[in-house]
Amino acid sequence: MKHILSTPKLVRLKQRQEFLDIAASGKKWVMPGLILQAKKRIDEKIGIGFTVSRKVGNAVARNRAKRRLRVLASEALKNNTFAGYSFVVIGRAETNKRPYSLLRQDFIQALAKVGVISKRKSAQPIERLKK
C-alpha cells in the first residue's frame, strides 16, 4: 500500500561531474564537522554524495567518517522539505572526533545557511536520539 505523502527518491551522486557541478554553481557552508554544498535540481529527487579526502586519515578513518555522514544525512533528509536539491557532504578531520549530536547540529545549521531550510527550523532544539 502506498502512502499518500511518499518521500522523494534519494539518488546517490556517483560521477565526478555531478560533484564538480555542485561545487561550481551551488552554495557552500563550512562547519567544524563537515562542509555542505547544495544546488537546486531540475527534478523532484534528492541527490546526495559523500566525499572524504585522504587528509582525514587512512582508509579506515575515511570510511568511518563516510558512515557517520551517511547516517546523519539519511536521518535529516527523510522528509519532503529537501525534494529538488542535490547535496554534497564533505567530511573533515573533526568528523570522526566530534560527538554525533554536535555533528548533527552542524548539518542542520549548514542546511539553514545554504538556504534549504528556514533559520527558524534550525534554531529549534534538536530531538535527542533514543538509545
Where are each of the predicted segments found?
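Positively charged, solvent-exposed patches that mediate nucleic-acid binding
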Residues: M1-K131
